[in-house]
Amino acid sequence: MSLTAVIETNKGTINIELFADQTPITCANFINLIQKGYYDGLSFHRVISDFMIQGGCPLGTGTGGPGYRFEDEFSDDLKHDRAGILSMANAGPGTNGSQIFITHGPTPHLNGGHTVFGAVKSDSDQAVVNDIRMGDTMIKVHIEGDTETLLAGQQANLDQWNAALSDAFPDL
């Protein structure tokens, strides 16, 4: 299944291939939030040179989330082994929500602690990642590809997540 997240930022567009076959729960969560417009207008609230850029906090502080948490998904062949890896930011095991990060280079110390669920598609996408600074914005995020099968397989999770989202963000 070929799915691409397209993150339009104030610095340019980042195209990310999602690893939905290996991380279906994480990808379904990300896609669901994207389809609801959750990420649109959010900032990159944490940027560390030569390490990563992080966004997806509705408060812009790194302390917020969608109103629910879900478990990690680890795969032996998905590692933080290069620049451009998309992962879930978390506060420990089973605390994934909406915050994501994209690496500037290999970060092997994060393996087994953060779910890898995508990677930038090209050097030009990575150039945009490298140009992002704290406070830069995700203007609009959308998905390219057929999400129907993936989302149908995660319907029970989606129902739970969307109930929590409706409570926390009634305008989504």
What are these regions (language model features)?
Residues 1-172:
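Cyclophilin-like peptidyl-prolyl cis-trans isomerases
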